[in-house]
Amino acid sequence: MFDRYQREIHYLRLSVTDLCNLRCRYCMPDGVEKLEREAVLTYEEFLRLAALFARCGIDTVRVTGGEPLVRKNVAQLVAGLKATPGIHRVALTTNAVLLAEQLPALLDAGLDSVNISLDTLRPEVFRQITARDDFAAVQAGLQAALESGLPVKLNCVPQAGVNEGELEQLAALAKDNAMQVRFIEMMPIGYGAAMPCISGPELRARFARRWSELAPLSPAQEHALGDGPAVYYTVPGWQGSIGFIAAVHGKFCASCNRVRLTSQGFLRPCLASETGCDLRALLRSGADDAQLLAAIRETIWAKPREHHFNDSSMPATRGMYRIGG
C-alpha cells in the first residue's frame, strides 16, 4: 500500500528478539535489561501478523534482532514466512556467530539472502567493539554463507578511532567475492548518539582516492541488488561491489519503502520515530483480523515524511537492539 506521501511500502523488518550474543558498543553494551519472555511475540503471533501485512502489500520480510539466531528454531519462522501468501522474499540480518551451524536449516526453510554485520577483520578490534571473542565463528559463518551461493551483503559501521584504519581492507573483500560490502553511517540512535560519525560522502571520496576507477553501478545493476537505501560502486574486475548507506548525510526518506515490527509487537513506521502502534496489545486483547488490518493500514498511512536525525531536540533514545537493527 501507499502512505500519505505516495511511497509504496512493501518491506517489513521483523525483529524476533531483543537478545544478542555480542555487546556492540553502539547497539547493546553490557548491562542492558532484557525483556521478559512473555513480552515478546510468539512465532504464531508473528505469522498471523505477517499474513495481514501481506494483505497490505508487504512482499519482503527481513528477520532481525537483537540477534535473530539466538532465538530457538528461527528457521521454523522463516519457513512459515515463506509459506505465507504474498510474501515473496525472506532475508536475514545476523552477526553470523551462529550462522555456520544454522545455515543448512535456514536454506532448507527457503531463506533468500543474508546480511552479515561485521565491523572489523582484526580479532582484537572485534573484541573491542563487541566485548566478545567470537571473531573466528563470524569468519566461519561468512565463509559458509558465501560457499552456499546465498546472496550475501556485509554491513560495516565505520567508527572513528576504532576501525577507520581498515575500511579499505573491508571494502576490498568485494574484489574476490561476489558480495556487497556496505558502509553504514553511525546513526544518532541510542548508544550511537554519542559517537562520532564518519560520513558516507567522506568515505566514498577516500575510496575514490584508493581506487581511481571506482564507479557507480548502472541503475539496472543497482535494481538487481534490491530497492533499499544503499548506493553502490565497484571497480572494473571486481566480483562484488561497495555500498554506502548515508542515513545522516544523504537522507533517503523520500524513497523509503519499509516499516518495522519490534519483538514486542510494536509497529514503527520510521526507525527514528517513537510513533507507531502496539499490535501486541490488540492481538492479546482478542482483536480480529479486520481490526488488526485497520491498525496496520492506519500506521503505514501515517508514516512520517522524514527522520530528524539532525534535530537535537528530537533524540531517538531507544537502543537499536530493541528497535530491530
Segments (PLM) and residue ranges:
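Short, small-residue-enriched loops and turns at beta-alpha junctions
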Residues: 16, 35, 67-71, 159-162, ...
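Glycine-centered loop/turn positions within well-structured domains
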Residues: 22, 123-124, 251, 277
